[in-house]
């Protein structure tokens, strides 16, 4: 049972109703009261503090409190049933049942007290029904002799039925899909057909971006393509770190999604194609349509990089995390850095390219659903309605050069922290839409947003998404950079050919035409299990650019092999075998003792 009063805050009461009875019973019983209070507080502490759950999933920067909850629940429920079955203390059971009833009633009242929660009344009724069954069974088991004889089996049967019937993670409308739903409703939007069609046309190694949302973040796994999003409770630390450094803000480390955020960033991750839903008008300066399948239009990324590219310059990692999103993208084009190590000094120093700034403040035309005042202090909007925004048309000349890389910079003065959005139009768009929008937060401390945007923009719209007293646009400008000066052309022309990937093995022909070493960045996320060979000789795999694999390439043409193997696999298999053997020996000994007693 999960109480969820706010979208990002969940209070977990229990996975099974039986746990509430167990805790209530041990709290009421004098002999176990102190231990129950201590262990319950300890369980809550372990759930809140991520250390234990991170240890349980063996992944740094990832945690899953459910593992800890389920383990403690199973232990508490088992001890509870054992104690009730052995002692048959009617008074303690009755008092514990009363306390459990009070706790559950208070929990339900708490859930229903929040107006922003739409409680699933059907599931709430089923929860109450199972609670009553447990209550009658536990109280009756200590008072009725015939019921007492089948008490453990009866409780186990009800527990199994509860876990099957209440296949929902919460009392609100967030259900787990069934097999039939997966077949008819989920992962059935044409993406699989488009991916199969594209694979028949181009079987090289690449990632695919999407302009639309499918049912789940693990869409790529289910529909057969290498995507830019995932939802896993055990995301590797390198992926979590990379997304925290470069990706948009998400609910938790379990969610990773780069779709539609930054086409240059996606190119650096090996993205070569974009799937667009019906009617989607991709920015023509960035994407070229190459086919249709499954009701989707397939676009080729004009800025795609080879799946593996060479850096000849290096950054110092210190301070890079404080840069704006725009500058972070520019640093990734112009050079690499070691994620957890100091600058080597073996490469030429990288630097940001020169920029040209063009103000858009004079392009403002109108304000919608708010009042606007335009003076020397900026553009101030007040009296915000349901969808307040300011429109900047006629900006196509500022984004017309395909040989430049463009970014937007917006500086605000706000009465309080707010959510913002910048919509953009490109040629062929009939209006602003959710297909082309950047969302972000503006605070009094962090009042500037900067981001890479595509060429070919014709109009812009700035939205204030939160009801506040006022918002002032202090500065709104285009930042442009010569594409060659950014370092993009160097990466694009990297001598990385004959790329292939199968059975966790990446192979490529890499030509370093300089007299110095270069750093090959392969856009796989770094983990301890990666190993590399150059012309058959083993070399080090480095963690670069906050989580990608890096291999130092000497001068000349080389055959590079990058292979992944699960670390400590042999040790894990050995420990499993030893554990099974110990279990068999202990179990056999107990069987032998019981057999002797029967004889």
Segments predicted by a language model, with ranges:
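Contiguous transmembrane helix-bundle modules in multi-pass membrane proteins
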Residues: 31-187, 555-599
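Extracellular glycan-recognition surfaces and repeat-rich motifs
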Residues: 359-376
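Active-site-proximal, structured, solvent-exposed surfaces of multi-pass membrane proteins
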Residues: 404, 426-429, 482-599
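Soluble catalytic regions of membrane-associated enzymes that act on cell-envelope
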Residues: 150-363, 415-420, 451-453, 461-469, ...
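Short proline/glycine- and polar residue-rich coil/turn motifs
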Residues: 439-445, 452-454, 542-544, 552-556
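Alpha-helical transmembrane segments at the extracellular/periplasmic loop-to-helix junctions
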Residues: 1-27, 53, 70, 121-135, ...
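Extracellular ligand-binding interfaces
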Residues: 381-449
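Noncatalytic modules at the cell exterior or secretory-pathway interfaces
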Residues: 407, 452-470, 555-561
């Amino acid at each position: 049972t999960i109480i969820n009063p706010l979208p990002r805050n969940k209070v977990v009461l229990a996975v099974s109703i039986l746990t509430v009875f167990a805790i209530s019973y041990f709290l009421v019983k004098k002999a176990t009261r102190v231990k129950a209070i201590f262990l319950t507080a300890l369980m809550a502490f372990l759930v809140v503090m991520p250390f234990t759950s991170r240890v349980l999933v063996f992944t740094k920067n990832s945690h899953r409190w459910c593992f800890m909850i389920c383990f403690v629940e199973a232990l508490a429920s088992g001890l509870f049933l054992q104690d009730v079955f052995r002692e048959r203390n009617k008074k303690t059971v009755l008092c514990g049942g009363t306390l459990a009833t009070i706790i559950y009633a208070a929990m339900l009242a708490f859930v229903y007290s929040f107006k922003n929660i739409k409680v699933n009344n059907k599931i709430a009724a089923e929860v109450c029904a199972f609670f009553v069954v447990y209550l009658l069974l536990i109280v009756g088991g200590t008072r009725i002799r015939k019921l007492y004889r089948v008490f453990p089996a009866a409780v186990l049967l009800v527990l199994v039925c509860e876990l099957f019937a209440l296949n929902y993670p919460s009392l609100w409308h967030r259900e787990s899909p069934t097999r039939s739903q997966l077949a008819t409703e989920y992962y059935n939007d044409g993406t699989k057909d488009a991916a199969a069609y594209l694979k028949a046309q181009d079987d090289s190694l690449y990632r695919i971006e999407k302009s639309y949302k499918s049912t789940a973040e693990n869409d790529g796994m289910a529909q057969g393509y290498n995507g830019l999003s995932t939802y896993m409770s055990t995301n590797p630390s390198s992926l979590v770190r990379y997304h925290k450094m470069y990706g948009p803000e998400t609910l938790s480390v379990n969610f990773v999604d780069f779709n539609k955020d930054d086409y240059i960033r996606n190119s650096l991750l090996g993205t070569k194609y974009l799937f667009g839903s019906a009617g989607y008008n991709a920015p023509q300066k960035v994407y070229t349509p190459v086919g249709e399948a499954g009701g989707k239009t397939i676009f080729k990324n004009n800025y795609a990089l080879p799946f593996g590219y060479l850096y000849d310059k290096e950054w110092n990692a210190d301070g890079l995390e404080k840069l704006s999103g725009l500058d972070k993208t520019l640093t990734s084009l112009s050079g690499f850095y070691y994620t957890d190590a100091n600058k080597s000094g073996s490469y030429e120093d990288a630097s940001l390219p020169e920029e040209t700034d063009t103000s858009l403040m004079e392009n403002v035309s109108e304000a919608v659903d708010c009042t606007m005042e335009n003076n020397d202090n900026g553009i101030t909007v007040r009296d915000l309605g349901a969808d307040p925004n300011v429109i900047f048309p006629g900006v196509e000349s500022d984004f017309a050069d395909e040989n430049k890389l463009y970014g937007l910079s917006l500086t605000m003065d706000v009465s309080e922290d707010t959510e913002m959005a910048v919509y953009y139009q490109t040629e062929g768009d009939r209006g602003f839409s959710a297909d082309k929008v950047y969302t972000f937060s503006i605070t009094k401390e962090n009042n500037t947003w900067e981001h890479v945007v595509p060429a070919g923009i014709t109009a812009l719209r700035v939205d204030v998404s939160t009801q506040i007293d006022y918002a002032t646009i202090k500065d709104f400008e285009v930042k442009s950079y010569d594409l060659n000066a950014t370092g993009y052309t160097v990466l694009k022309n990297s001598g990385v050919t004959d790329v292939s990937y199968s059975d966790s093995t990446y192979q490529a022909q890499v030509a370093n035409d300089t007299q110095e070493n270069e750093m090959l960045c392969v856009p796989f996320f770094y983990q301890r299990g990666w190993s590399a060979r150059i012309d058959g000789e083993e070399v080090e795999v480095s963690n670069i650019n906050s989580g990608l694999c890096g291999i130092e390439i000497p001068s000349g043409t080389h055959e590079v092999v990058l292979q992944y193997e699960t670390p400590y696999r042999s040790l894990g298999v050995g420990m499993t075998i030893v554990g099974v053997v110990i279990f068999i020996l202990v179990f056999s000994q107990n069987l032998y003792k019981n057999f002797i007693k029967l004889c």
